[in-house]
Amino acid sequence: MKLLPAQPFRLKTVPVAVCLFVAVLALRLYGLANLTESLFLLPSAGDMHFYDDWALRILRGNWTDHMAFYGLPLYAYLLAAIYWVCGHNPFVPAFLQACLDAGTAVLLYKLGAAVFATSAGEKSLSDSAPRGKIIGLLAAIGWACFQPAQGYSIILMPTAWLVFVFWFVVWQIVKRQQAPSLWTLALMGVLMGFTAMGIATILFLVPLLLAALFLRWKGAAARRLAGAGIVIAGVFLGASPAWIHNYFIARDPVFLSAHSGVNFWIGNNPVATGYPKFPPGLHAGQEAMLKDSITSAEKAMGRPLKRSEVAAFWSEKARAWIRAHPGDFVRLLGTKFKNFWSAFSYDDISVITALRDQSIILLGLGFGLVAALGLPGLLFAWWRIPGSRWVGAAVLLHMASLLTVFVTERYRLAAVPGLLLFAAFGVYELWRNLSTQRYRLAGIFLLLLFGSTAFVSMPQKDPTLWALDTYNSGLQALEAKNFSLARRKLELAYAYSPENAEINFAQGNLHLATGDVTAAKRFYLGALRLDPTHAGAYNNLGVLALEEKRWPLAGNFFRHALEYAPNDSKTHYLLARAELNSGNLANARKEIARAIQLDPRHPEFFALQKEIETTKPDQR
């Protein structure tokens, strides 16, 4: 048998998209490998812990609490499925997200090639590399180096999933010159509906798909109407696990999640800044905020509420403020618009700073540079390349979804791939205009670039915003018992914003952990002066009073804490102990019974109940 000669491997035979995927995945895996050797792989607090804890509850068989979802459920159930197959290991979902993020880079390359393809009679800078592919490659490289994408692709957050699906749908629209089949439209609707159970802003792409049906693709009116109906039906079908659970298991008319009401209030209230500044009565952190929002609504209404009623309560507060202050609302929208494009990074969970400080992710691009280049590129492309308007519309629709609530670094991340395409186009066109001596066009672009740079660089004057990263970094150091780093970070946060209740509370926790009880009390009282509803400060002051055997004072602090957090089982337990030591056995029995009713998993609750039952009135 005659053997064929071996063919040497040539790199140029490997598609660019494959090389891109492998290169970006390697960068993300570098960050993930560093993450596995750090304290940040297993979340202990914040939004990441919220999802991780929810997934673990599902694994234990707590599929539902028979109430409407109060938090979008998809990511928690997805984590639970991964944990069920692979065990409780955050590495696996992070690896999948790294793959998706590499896929986003490939989508950028393909979008660039499709949208910015060299038109007839137009010459590219390189005969061997058409304009569209160069722009797509530049945008993909920008995405690989974009620092927030590096961070959010490897932690337990659903952001990478949204970004990939968002731009996959845009690519499906842009790459087609003819209307897709009804079956394809149905699948796209299902995909958007399913993804909305994780991040609801994907639904702002539905109008883009419907617009493509009527404006981009030709077809009979009846077929267009049928396609629109199928897309909408697909969205409802994709989201059906959420609304079926809410309507038929919880018997509560909620489409996806009832927490949309409190988000609307946080974004539209008298003290709103366009960022998630929590009004009095609500505390930072997803889990704490959700609990506070239910407790505050029920206290205001004087009765237990369904989740839909909680959502309606907060939505009506926001709408009432908007009706009463239309001028302030318009100014707030302008502030949100400015915040969306600002170079200032409001990373509400401070993951980017933490990962960068620990050298887990590489130094890279920030939003400010991308926005400064992307805005003039968007204007030029909108003018010269009609196909790019679909990409621009996707960016603007995503921005519109945030104007209804508030802006954070992770929320605006889905707009970055589109801005990178426009930034790459702008740089490409600037170089081409300079090389071909089209100085007028180059000058116009540079003038727009100067204006966009000035716009995105407008300073943030609120010192509390500058305190966010140092505050969150201080909390992370405190949880890791790195008290010297925690002190340095929290003191800097306090210097930025001494009148912030949460920073005062964190300072109290730091001084308590380091044994300075007097300073801890001072900061807890400072937190209560700034926020009289701060249940955590009341609780910790009660614990200190217990340790000092000042039983009546401890009881008073715990009762105040329960006014604002009535379903906290630990506080009921501590109040029962204070009442027992004060000799109020009847109250002690009532409080420990309530603690056990709320959370029967704690053996110390039953031990205290037994101690109360065996205590005679004259023994105290």
Task: Map each language-model feature to its residues.
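Membrane-interface anchor segments at the N-terminal boundary of transmembrane helices
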Residues: 92, 320-391
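Transmembrane-helix signature of polytopic, membrane-embedded enzymes
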Residues: 19-20, 108-145, 163-164, 183, ...
